[in-house]
Amino acid sequence: MFNFFKKIVNKIKGEEVKEKKRESVPKEELEEILIGFDIQYDLIESLLKHLGDLITPKQLEVALLRFVRGESYYDKTRLKTITTKPLVHLIVGVNGAGKTTTIAKLAKLSLKQHKKALLGAGDTFRAAAVKQLQLWGEKLNVQVISAKEGSDPSSLAYNTIESAIAKNIDEVFIDTAGRLHNQTNLKNELSKIAHTCSKVLKDAPFYKFLILDGTQGSSGLTQAKIFHETLALDGVIMTKLDGTSKGGAILSVLYELKLPILYLGMGEKEDDLIAFDEERFIEDLVDAVFVEQ
């Protein structure tokens, strides 16, 4: 399967390779291609139902743009603006999705904007997660608030935000646990952390971002729904997209959850985070569909 995310990276690096494109594709074949990109079948049907038996690149592009800009999605898939200081980001997701690395990338973005950042090692039951965040903190020269292994993560969140207030920090990024094998405990823990954040911020708003492993495709939606039901998420960051052809899951997130896709993780370095551009995404998806095999 053509990896159109690699194409996005190549474009950014100025290494784009020109490929021959087909002028049209039969609808049945197009459905198979889009399924291969891990787009849900009911969404595919919705996109193509008003199109003929032969579909051109322009027709598919228009259908995709109508989808992402339609009334039911457009307003709901914009990130709300929060001006509170410190601006707190509660970062959630299953273990292995790339939460800790993504937090480092977000902190790097904050530093690039000449803001002061602070990290909270809230996955207190995993010493490796705390250590990894501390290493990133050292590399970025950003303080990491941590606690003894097994400490209450809500207390850690409280202490992190209190420290940020005292130090006039601009942005706070708090890591969390992601042990989905025990859903009830995890949901209770995350709810408690969110409540604590609200309390210390005196009910001022804060962000709740989900880190979703892009290699899992649409199967990651089940995880996403659990986190969204628990926290009322504000946005999604898709990771590990430099090595997958399952980018259609981005459309499935918009379709199922009506949440904004904020960034795409394209590697392990702190700069490998690309702001999601829906027009570029659609353009590259359409190019990938119509490339001659």
Swiss-Prot record:
What is this entry's stated membrane topology? Answer: Peripheral membrane protein
Q: Which keywords accompany this UniProt record?
A: Cell inner membrane, Cell membrane, Cytoplasm, GTP-binding, Hydrolase, Membrane, Nucleotide-binding, Receptor
Gene Ontology biological process? SRP-dependent cotranslational protein targeting to membrane
**PROSITE patterns named among the record's database cross-references:** SRP54 (PS00300)
The entry lists its GO molecular-function terms as: GTP binding; GTPase activity; signal recognition particle binding
Q: What is its main location?
A: membrane
Pfam hit, one: SRP54
Compartments reported by the entry: Cell inner membrane; Cytoplasm
Q: What is its EC number?
A: 3.6.5.4
User: Gene Ontology cellular component?
Assistant: cytoplasm; plasma membrane
Give the domain of life: Bacteria
Which reaction is recorded as catalysed by this protein?
GTP + H2O = GDP + phosphate + H(+)
InterPro entries, A to Z: P-loop_NTPase (IPR027417), SR_rcpt_FtsY (IPR004390), SRP54_GTPase_dom (IPR000897), SRP54_N_sf (IPR042101)
The UniProt annotation places GTP binding at 93-100, 175-179, 239-242
Assembly description: Part of the signal recognition particle protein translocation system, which is composed of SRP and FtsY. SRP is a ribonucleoprotein composed of Ffh and a 4.5S RNA molecule.
Q: What does this protein do?
A: Involved in targeting and insertion of nascent membrane proteins into the cytoplasmic membrane. Acts as a receptor for the complex formed by the signal recognition particle (SRP) and the ribosome-nascent chain (RNC). Interaction with SRP-RNC leads to the transfer of the RNC complex to the Sec translocase for insertion into the membrane, the hydrolysis of GTP by both Ffh and FtsY, and the dissociation of the SRP-FtsY complex into the individual components.
Family to which this protein belongs: Belongs to the GTP-binding SRP family. FtsY subfamily.
Full protein name: Signal recognition particle receptor FtsY
